[in-house]
Design a protein with these regions (language model features):
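Alpha-helical transmembrane segments of integral membrane proteins
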Residues: 34, 44, 167-170, 177, ...
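Gly/Trp-centered helix-boundary motif
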Residues: 1-238, 242, 391, 395, ...
Length: 453
């Protein structure tokens, strides 16, 4: 196989490296580690962090791309498939390759729509055909309930065995987590819930379509897991674009004041006066026109979809920095009047050194709180933009495209509800975990909130 590094792959690896570096810096500085210990002592924060790490792990696995090798021809030269795959695709191959003809309900053994079937005696009747893969191992369909129960119990047993293999050594050596008992309990219970769910899915997914299939017969569970990367990337990469603009302009406006402050205020006031959805839609349509007129820029469809996703992150970042910039401007106006900042200016310390050593450390809590609180909003923004047709590439799997595809399915009779339900369930868990973690981070890092409580 030939490794492939897309633009968003490199950026997500950069973000992971930055997160690891941030953890190392925090552990080496007591004044930085103290508030994060308060976060780690909160059971809700620990549980939410474990869920977010699980989603992030899936996104990273889906960012390790490659092009599979084709059988060697007569020339002996290595040939590679034009389709770009990921490590997650390789892991999900047992369910990705099990494609049916069209819709089927969760755990169904027959298609959702009737078709003309020719019987053994030559008669043609309209009935629900048997699925090729869903329950295809069953000789008698009446055994389905017992088979699902048996496989679910095996999956639960496997998940519990893995959990015990992790928990018992850590508990015996008392190194589970250097925080309170409540956080330890939340950590291990959350890991247990994730492992039990994973065990059940591993046991059932190769034999049944757990969340059914869509219009083209694709397994909805596979599409939902592949959509996680898009949601995580939208939230993470947009933040990567937002932070430099918000920090640079917001802190500069508050510290220097005068004309700099006037220009920055005029800039974000003008941006806020433009309806956000219209501004984003106009920018996306311009970008889409540019990509369609230059198809020679891309070797594969995955590269084209990836570049569109990257541009969408850039557009969202350049239109969402105003709120954080306004908060940083207000906080910097207060910090610049503190005694140690005034003393530094009196001793001739340069403005750049004052900003780096005195101002930025005192506004970092606002940055961190804003980052974690905006993440969930950006995930929802992708769903809304894809729903109105100006989101990610239609061929890319995402929660927004799944919801957009389910819109017409809800209007048919009988209703095809499972694609919308699957996208809603996974997006709900991701956004809820992000919101709960953001609330805990805000409570731990905001000094005003701690004093008032």
């Amino acid at each position: 196989m030939m490794p492939v590094v897309l633009w968003t792959d490199g950026l997500i690896f950069l973000l992971v490296a930055g997160l690891v570096g941030f953890v190392v810096v925090v552990r080496r500085n007591e004044h930085l580690a103290a508030p994060w210990r308060r976060v780690a002592a909160d059971p809700v924060a620990v549980a939410a962090a474990v869920v977010l790490l699980c989603f992030t792990g899936i996104a990273v696995l889906d960012s390790l791309h490659f092009r599979p090798a084709l059988p060697t021809g007569a020339s002996g030269e290595a040939q590679y498939a034009p389709e770009v795959k990921s490590l997650l695709d390789r892991l999900l191959a047992p369910i990705a390759e099990r494609q049916e003809k069209t819709y089927s309900a969760p755990f169904a053994t027959r298609l959702f729509a009737k078709e003309a079937i020719t019987l053994a005696d030559g008669r043609t009747v309209r009935d629900y055909p048997r699925l090729k893969y869903g329950g295809g191992h069953l000789a008698d369909e009446s055994e389905r309930a017992g088979d699902i129960l048996q496989r679910s119990l095996l999956g639960l047993a496997g998940g519990l065995a893995v959990w015990l293999a992790l928990f018992l050594p850590a508990h015996a050596k008392r190194r589970a987590f250097p925080v309170g008992e409540g956080s330890k309990r939340a950590l291990w219970l959350t890991v247990l819930a994730i492992l039990l769910t994973t065990g059940v899915l591993i046991a059932l997914a190769p034999h049944y379509h757990v969340f059914g299939t869509d219009k083209v017969g694709q397994d909805v569970l596979y599409a939902t897991l592949k959509s996680i990367r898009t949601g995580v990337l939208i939230g993470a990469l947009t933040t990567l674009v937002t932070l430099p603009l918000a920090i640079g302009l917001g802190v500069s406006a508050g510290y220097f004041g005068g004309r700099v402050d006037d220009v920055v205020q005029y800039l974000y006031t003008t941006l806020n006066a433009i309806p956000g959805v219209l501004l984003i839609a106009a920018a996306v349509l311009l970008m889409q026109t540019q990509l369609e007129t230059h198809p020679d820029w891309f070797e594969t469809g995955a590269e084209r979809a990836d570049l569109r996703l990257l541009f969408l992150c850039l557009i969202l970042g350049m239109t969402n920095w105003t709120g954080l910039a306004r908060l940083l401007r207000g906080e910097t106006l207060k910090v610049r009047e503190l005694d140690y900042v005034v003393a530094a200016r009196a001793f001739g310390v340069s403005n750049g050194r004052i900003l780096l050593r005195h101002v930025l450390p005192n506004v970092q809590h606002i940055v961190l709180i804003s980052v974690v609180m905006d993440f969930s909003g950006l995930v929802l923004a992708e769903a809304v933009l894809s729903y109105v047709g100006v989101g990610v590439d239609p061929g890319m799997l995402s929660f927004g495209n799944m919801i957009n595809g389910a819109r017409l399915e809800l209007a048919r009779e009988p209703v095809v509800w499972w694609q919308l339900a699957a996208a809603f369930l996974f997006m709900f868990v991701l956004v809820l975990a992000a919101n709960l973690f953001a609330d805990c981070v805000r409570d731990a890092l905001d000094p005003r909130g701690r004093r008032s409580s």
